[in-house]
């Protein structure tokens, strides 16, 4: 018998301020990788994490 596909998937979180503010001169965009349960969290994940380019805690959203 084939094993069922797991519920956990690996996702990437990206800083929203680095991406949307082109006037701010930053060397890059902050990205974190984490896992989420596909069955319990169906929508896009949004967490407050530290961005080393903005040098503050910002909202990081899930990207595809």
From Swiss-Prot:
Q: Name one GO biological process term.
A: translation
User: What GO terms are given for molecular function?
Assistant: structural constituent of ribosome
Q: What PROSITE patterns does the record point to? A: RIBOSOMAL_L33 (PS00582)
Keywords in alphabetical order = Ribonucleoprotein, Ribosomal protein
Q: According to its record, what are the GO cellular component terms? A: cytoplasm; ribonucleoprotein complex; ribosome
Q: Name one Pfam family in it.
A: Ribosomal_L33
Q: Which Gene3D superfamilies match?
A: Ribosomal protein L33
Q: Which family does it belong to?
A: Belongs to the bacterial ribosomal protein bL33 family.
PANTHER family for the chain: 50S RIBOSOMAL PROTEIN L33, CHLOROPLASTIC, LARGE RIBOSOMAL SUBUNIT PROTEIN BL33C
- Output this protein's name: Large ribosomal subunit protein bL33
Species this chain originates from? Thermosynechococcus vestitus (strain NIES-2133 / IAM M-273 / BP-1)
Instruction: Print the organism lineage.
Output: Bacteria, Bacillati, Cyanobacteriota, Cyanophyceae, Acaryochloridales
Q: Gene symbol?
A: rpmG
């Amino acid at each position: 018998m084939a094993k069922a596909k797991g519920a956990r998937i690996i996702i990437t979180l990206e800083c929203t301020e680095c991406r949307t503010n082109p006037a701010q001169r930053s060397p890059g965009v902050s990205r974190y990788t984490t896992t989420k349960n596909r069955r319990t969290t169906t929508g896009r994940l949004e967490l407050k994490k530290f961005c080393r380019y903005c040098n503050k805690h910002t909202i990081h959203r899930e990207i595809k």
